[in-house]
Regions:
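Thiamine diphosphate
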Residues: 1-46
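Flexible, low-complexity linker and terminal segments
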Residues: 27-215
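Conserved PLP-anchoring active-site segment centered on the Schiff-base-forming lysine
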Residues: 218
Length: 218
């Protein structure tokens, strides 16, 4: 809840995904709110992981025309007893920890490949002078404010970050910016990977972004 419109704080709940080492999906508009639920379920089934489906106040208060695709029927999978997986004793947790780390690596690879094909992540190359990595409602603001020719890497799968994709994108632009609300969640990880970028120096740590704040950064 950036700017505390209906809560006592504006804590950045993206950190929960990182702490729990699970996938996180963030839509930026009404169409994606519908589409990304199906993609989040796909991610969950493919990688046997919980998915944190994160929406912010501004995304939840948005509205727009939404196209529906063909309805897909799914059969319920039968219950299979799996004590090692579902009973988290110390011995089971010890054995399962490597599986969690392997899952994160597979999710990173998915973010660089399949997620680009199904629209979960989106790459929009411009003239190469300015590149912006962004997600959620910040993408909508940046698209409206920054001039034509700006390159965008718009992430719907925001944890784990597809670092190889980000590194490749960074190599194709002269100046790289990270635009996100609240904490420098993506920015810190990108800098930790040795990729120079500019972020909170321009947009700040407080409150939700808007066209005015984003235009100041531009």
């Amino acid at each position: 809840d950036p700017s505390c419109h209906s809560s006592q704080n504006e804590q950045d709940n993206r950190h929960y995904a990182r702490a729990a080492k699970i996938a996180m999906v963030e839509p930026s508009d009404a169409q994606e709110c519908k589409d990304f639920v199906a993609l989040a379920c796909e991610v969950s089934e493919l990688f046997d992981t919980p998915v944190l489906y994160r929406t912010t106040t501004r995304v939840c208060h948005s509205k727009g025309l939404v196209e529906f695709g063909q309805r897909t029927e799914h059969t319920h999978a039968p219950y299979a007893r799996n004590v090692r997986k579902f009973v988290c004793t110390p011995a089971h947790a010890y054995a399962n920890h490597p599986l969690v780390e392997e899952r994160l690596e597979k999710l990173r690879e998915y973010g660089c490949t399949r997620a680009l094909e199904n629209g979960l992540n989106k790459l929009e190359m411009g003239d190469g002078r300015v590149g912006i990595i962004t997600a959620s409602i910040a993408y909508e603001y940046a698209k409206e404010v920054f001039p034509e020719g700006t390159s965008f890497l718009k992430l719907g799968l925001t944890f784990p970050l597809p670092m190889d994709l980000i590194r490749d994108f960074a190599s194709k632009v002269e100046k790289l910016y990270v635009i996100e609300e609240l904490e420098p969640f993506m920015e810190d990880q990108i800098k930790a990977a040795g990729i120079p970028c500019v972020g909170k120096e321009l947009t700040g740590l407080l409150y939700e972004l808007c066209l005015l704040y984003t235009s100041d950064a531009a």
